[in-house]
Amino acid sequence: MSNDLKKTPLYDRFVESNAKIVEFGGWAMPVQFSSIKEEHNAVREVMGIFDVSHMGEVLIEGKDASDFIQYILSNDTDQLTDNKAQYTALCNDKGGIIDDLITYKLDNQKYLLVVNAANTEKDYNWINSHSENFDVKVENVSDQYGQLAVQGPEARDYVGSLVDVDVSEMKPFDFKKDVTIFGKNIILSQSGYTGEDGFEIYCNSDDVVDIWDGLLENENLVPAGLGARDTLRLEAGLPLHGQDLSEDITPYEGGIAFAAKPLIEADFIGKEVLKEQKENGSAERTIGLEMLDKGIPRTGYDVLDLDGNKIGVVTSGTQSPATGKGIALAIINRDEFEMGREVLVQIRKRQVKAKIVKKNQISK
């Protein structure tokens, strides 16, 4: 593994834990601590903790901040209220997804964008290059932040017992500023990437080790790596940029149409393409797949009709720890979509039966 990889402040903790470290988006990150299945099940059944300090943070502030983010982001940022976050995307002129991200409204003139680690520099440069006609300051503040995710059925009660605010009524994408945990100031967000209840904790990068150590005083909290994070998000039908989303895929094609604006008067990047797809539909759409026969669908495998004609491609796939079955997200021709339809996945030299299912495959 290259010595040039970036490391989060928790890297030494990973080494001490004998975690398996891999390269991810230019970072040295733990793929697993014990086993992917154990960590996955801990999050589904009890709770787990992830270091996500590799994620990027871009701060936008100034008199025109609200107008600027409405211009550059796919979702309707006028719907943002204080202490509310929003899932959204940066789109290019063709509606393609440069990145998917979370926007936090800190106040009327200050917004924090949390972007994917591998895209941080690209996103920052792109955002900054479109800011010249707005009275805003765009700053890459990624080095200032640490981020932890505590996820699972017991996460709310546990985190709630440690902070100085009431979390019992927090709903998805609610957040609270100036929260204290272990004497440290944090932003507490009711969000995650697992399909479970839980929180994401944003803190000063100098505080993340102390908060990690403090949280792990509870033996029921299990450290989890990128492997479990991937199987959890795939079961939940949550896309990963670079696989399920890309600059050639629009929100309507990528299964995140809810993150595209309604038809508003204001100008925004990608408006014409997104407007046309909203009114007339896109040529392709993202689906969930469940394998009916033995086999694990992987990124790039062709999806075929029962006559062997190609109708799409797998964008992400794995074996579900919950069911033992192969599951996937795939993008197919819209005309070929029918819920429950049987299809084939070309797995090496075999054509293996699967069926179209909901993207979220968590059995609750």
Swiss-Prot record:
One of its GO terms (molecular function) is transaminase activity. Its EC number is 2.1.2.10. GO terms for biological process: glycine decarboxylation via glycine cleavage system. GO terms for cellular component: cytosol; glycine cleavage complex. It is an enzyme of class 2 (transferase). The glycine cleavage system catalyzes the degradation of glycine. HAMAP family: GcvT (MF_00259). NCBIfam families: gcvT, PRK00389.1. This is Aminomethyltransferase. It comes from Staphylococcus carnosus (strain TM300). The gene is gcvT.
